[in-house]
Amino acid sequence: MSYTKLSRDQIAERVAQDIPDGAYVNLGIGLPTKISNYLPSDKDVFLHSENGLLAFGPPPAKGEEDPELINAGKEFVTMLTGGAFFHHGDSFAMMRGGHLDIAVLGAFQIAENGDLANWHTGAPDAIPAVGGAMDLAVGAKKVFITTDHVTKQGEPKIVAELSYPATGLKCVDRVYTDLCVIDVTAEGMKVIEKVEGLSFDELQSMTGAKLIDATKG
């Protein structure tokens, strides 16, 4: 059977469904920032950004951008009623102190035990950029990952062991790819959802770690 990969917006929308009411959440640079567009209005979700924002909202309408309102990815944002601004040092204290419920990050590699690599490929010409990723990986109560299932070269991003420098060890709780959703558990990597038309065997063939089929039916 044929299958269609999820778009970046579809991945973001899927993650938004799993963010509970009242959660304090950091959205990493790149794909995770799209999640703010899909949070339902009936949920109170407090979005945090490393540069010192709490309770920001989706991007403003074109022409209504405020150059002083940007997130850590230098993207324009809006502020919700009751939102707060604070020092960069205070922001990192929130991250490191266990005050964030969820961090949503990107990844170069995720190991089957939950190890994460997302700051450096180890290539001699690569520019390392850890930012606040290490602080979030160890400080947030839960870590969600959004990523393509394979690289542009077709190599698995979900692997048995990291070959890139680690960001955090045993820190990942759930992985959202363009093909599936995986829970990282003590028993192993459990596939709880996959795109329609994709068989479990096909998914396993594109994954460098052993998967457990936990899909319903």
State the predicted function of each range.
Residues 2-10, 61-217:
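Conserved phosphate- and dinucleotide-binding cores of soluble alpha/beta proteins
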Residues 1-80:
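N-terminal active-site beta-alpha-beta segment that forms phosphate/nucleotide-binding
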